[in-house]
């Protein structure tokens, strides 16, 4: 099996080596690990990161034999903002203008979200100690440097729970989120989990 992993970075330029210690343990168990380097928010706004993740999945499917991966057992995973990109790689279905590997699809067998920054529908404040809505926030920059407090439609566009309904085709999902997270509000994962259970 292959895990296409999206390194969290607040959608800024990634340090794609920062989780190699953890990922190497999965590799020791027989997983092929592919780490995605996406266009960061300083280059391209949402949904570029999710589209780049989709193209990475397609690349691994096409080159599965070369990397000794099973193209029928692909998973997408990510931590923090990478969890957001992993989720949206499966929520976005139309990316033909930026699909650079049309001979393969971007569907996976499962999504793994580790403390994913899945929503910006929550107000700033505890337990998160960060700014999530102002133009210079990671989320504001991800949407092109806008003040998200005045753009609820953009907040909905970028929030997982606002893009899921009973007809949304999603693979099985595994979510992790610590209750003492001070960067990404753990209530976000709870809301998404409850919505997924509902549907």
Could you say what each language-model-derived stretch is?
Residues 1-199:
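Alpha/beta-hydrolase superfamily serine-hydrolase fold, recognizing
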